[in-house]
Regions:
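Catalytic phosphate/metal-binding cores of nucleic-acid and nucleotide-processing enzymes, i.e., regions
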Residues: 39, 77, 331, 412, ...
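ASCE P-loop NTPase helicase motor core
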Residues: 26-27, 31, 36-229
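Conserved helicase motor core of P-loop NTPases
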Residues: 4-6, 25, 29-30, 37, ...
Length: 472
């Protein structure tokens, strides 16, 4: 009886007539929410265009109406902004919610798993394909295993449960072969009962989309393990996917920037080296920026930084992959064989929060994701020499951990990024450069890369310099 009422309420909040698959999902969700067992997790796997976001949005609005507690937990700040918008409900990053800072006598803070003081609350995690469970050596967070810590946090609260949603065709976390948070056996390993629902049918409203037509074909090829020849991309008959010759790139990018803004346009590349070439060209030939760093420059954080936000409430730390806009550039200087700048940044995904940082300029140009290890070590030992007069090692390390140069923020330009950096985000205009393809690149990883890149676009996908034999 109550099940039927809950199902009706969710359907009433649905923006359109549910598909048969969505009907099953609504029924399963209602049973999950009303189950007397608390040691149960709901896994909603859905491909692009199958309506999983609409379904969860309807669920959240229903819970709000019934005054039942829910917390939205995406993995990144940008994903939080997107999730909050479609669910009409505040969203927090996983790290912000499940970890708390621990300070040790002026040393750099660590983060331990928080106490879950909520009761009978549904925690909804979007973009769960991005959640890693690889133990990270030297991690500042809990056990270093995000999925372990998430499960521990949620189920330590009385009557609390977890709903994981994501897309198994997307790229798994770096260094992992699959996304553990969308793999039932991984969750059963915590002693949890797993309710699984898969959405595979593209909803009628999305069937005219060339982006989704091709994304659907790509994930079918992944499922069939047919990933060893160049996939054909269907462009004819679709308005949202275009082939772009290289000689039209600058004009088209410029038009997108003028029409939709820098923050709604992105270039996705195969490598950091290729992204660097794009970023250099875009800044010089489209934005006419002559200085290394200008007011208005769009940046992406290259590595987690805990130093500059230690005394800030708005951000616990500056996460790898977060975007920032340069508000002001003040002093630049060269020290230890590296270049630094005092910069005021604005973080658009955190209500335009403003922060003063010391920035390492060298990473803007490296072909690696962040400062290479050898360079990082060189910086460490160069700064350490400044404290050579301190004989007690522990005291020397304290000074290092409080040093603004050793803790300088590492960033890259954000006009062009790799696909892993783009994951979790959405843009109206996505320019996709897959680079020169050889047979050795034709693997399931490439197909997942392509699928993930395709599904970043909400408006138009531009295929830059695509070979004619790949287009139909």
């Amino acid at each position: 009886m109550i099940n039927n009422y809950l199902e009706r309420q969710i359907k009433e909040n649905f923006p359109y007539q549910p598909t048969p698959e969505q009907e099953i999902a609504v029924k399963s969700l209602s049973e999950f929410l009303l189950s007397p067992r608390s040691e149960v997790v709901f896994m909603l796997r859905g491909y692009a265009g199958t309506g999983k976001t609409s379904l969860v949005g309807a669920l959240v609005r229903t819970l709000d109406k019934l005054q039942q507690k829910s917390v939205l937990l995406p993995p990144t700040g940008q994903a939080a902004k997107i999730f909050s918008a479609y669910a009409g409900h505040p969203a927090f990053t996983i790290h912000k919610k499940i970890y708390r800072q621990q300070s040790f006598s002026n040393e750099l803070s660590n983060f331990s798993v928080n106490d879950n003081l909520t009761t009978h609350t549904l925690y909804i995690v979007d973009e769960a394909s991005m959640i890693s469970n690889e133990g990270l050596s030297g991690s500042m967070f809990g056990t270093g295993r995000l999925l372990d810590d998430l499960v521990q946090f949620v189920y330590s609260g009385q009557g609390c449960r977890l709903l994981l949603m994501g897309d198994t065709a997307q790229l798994p976390p770096v260094g992992e072969e699959q996304s553990p948070a969308l793999f039932a056996d991984a969750l059963k390993g915590y002693g949890l009962e797993v309710v699984e629902v898969d959405l595979t049918q593209v909803v009628r409203q999305e069937q005219q989309s060339g982006i989704l037509w091709n994304a659907t074909r790509l994930r079918q090829l992944i499922a069939e393990d047919d990933c060893y020849s160049l996939p054909k991309i269907k462009v004819s008959g679709f308005a949202d996917i275009k082939v772009l010759p290289g000689n039209e790139l600058i004009e088209t990018l410029n038009s997108c920037y003028d029409h939709d803004g820098l923050d709604e346009t992105i270039v996705v590349c195969r490598s950091n080296k290729r992204a660097n070439i794009y970023n250099k060209g875009i800044r010089a030939q489209i934005l006419w920026r002559e200085d290394e760093l200008n007011t208005g420059d769009l940046l992406m954080v290259a590595i987690n930084n805990y130093f500059w936000t230690e005394k800030e409430k708005e951000m616990d730390f500056i996460a790898n992959g977060e975007t920032a806009v340069v508000r002001r550039v003040r002093r630049t200087r060269e020290l230890y064989g590296f270049r630094f700048a005092d910069v005021t940044l604005v973080f658009p995904d955190y209500n335009d929060f403003e922060l003063e940082v010391n920035m390492l300029l060298d990473t803007l140009h490296t072909d690696s994701p962040a400062l290479p290890k050898a360079e990082n070590d060189r910086l460490f030992y160069s700064v350490l020499e400044d404290y050579a007069d301190i004989t007690v090692k522990r005291e020397r390390m304290k000074k290092m951990k409080a040093d603004p140069y050793y803790n300088a923020l590492q960033v890259k330009y954000a006009y062009a990024v790799t696909c892993h950096k783009a994951q979790g985000g959405q843009w109206k205009n996505v320019f996709l450069d897959q680079g020169y393809m050889t047979d050795e690149y034709l693997t399931p990883d490439y197909f997942r890369w392509l699928y993930t890149a395709f599904t970043r676009a909400t408006g138009t996908l531009y295929l830059v310099n695509y070979p004619e034999e790949q287009i139909v």
